[in-house]
Amino acid sequence: NLWQFEMLIMKIAKTSGFMFYSSYGCYCGWGGHGRPQDASDRCCFVHDCCYGKVTGVVVCGGDDPCKXQICECDRVAATCFRDNKYWFFPAK
C-alpha cells in the first residue's frame, strides 16, 4: 500500500516520498503523461510501468506472487530515488 511504499522510500532513500515526490514532474503522484522531466521523474515513470506489468488482483498475504512483484516495483523505485538527485519540478 501507499504507506508501506513511503516507509520503504524513507528507509532506502532517507527522504519522504510524500513530501518530495507526491506532486513532482510528469509521473510522480497520480497519473502520468508526457516526457519525464529528470532522473527522479523517470524513477516514477518506471515505477508506473512496473505496476502496469503486474496482472491480476493484488491480495495481501502469504505467498501471493502479485504482492511480491508490487514490493519489488516499490523497492526498485526507492533505490532509484536514492541514487538520483532531486530537482524541483512541480507536477505538470
Swiss-Prot record:
Stretches assigned to coiled coil: none
Reaction catalysed by this enzyme: a 1,2-diacyl-sn-glycero-3-phosphocholine + H2O = a 1-acyl-sn-glycero-3-phosphocholine + a fatty acid + H(+)
Keyword Oxidoreductase: no
Cofactor binding comment, as recorded: Binds 1 Ca(2+) ion.
CDD domains: PLA2c (cd00125)
Residues binding Ca(2+): Y27, G29, G31, D48
Active site per UniProt: H47, D74
Expressing tissues: Expressed by the venom gland.
Enzyme Commission code: 3.1.1.4
pH dependence: Optimum pH is 5.5-8.5.
Cofactor(s) for this UniProt protein: Ca(2+)
SMART domains: PA2c
Subcellular location field: Secreted
Cited SUPFAM superfamilies: Phospholipase A2, PLA2
Function: Snake venom phospholipase A2 (PLA2) that induces significant edematogenic activity. Shows mild cytotoxicity on Trypanosoma cruzi and Leishmania infantum. Also inhibits ADP- and collagen-induced platelet aggregation. Does not show myotoxic activity.
Subunit relationships: Monomer.
Family to which this protein belongs: Belongs to the phospholipase A2 family. Group II subfamily. D49 sub-subfamily.
Record's protein name: Acidic phospholipase A2 braziliase-II
Organism name: Bothrops brazili (Brazil's lancehead)
Source organism phylogeny: Eukaryota, Metazoa, Chordata, Craniata, Vertebrata
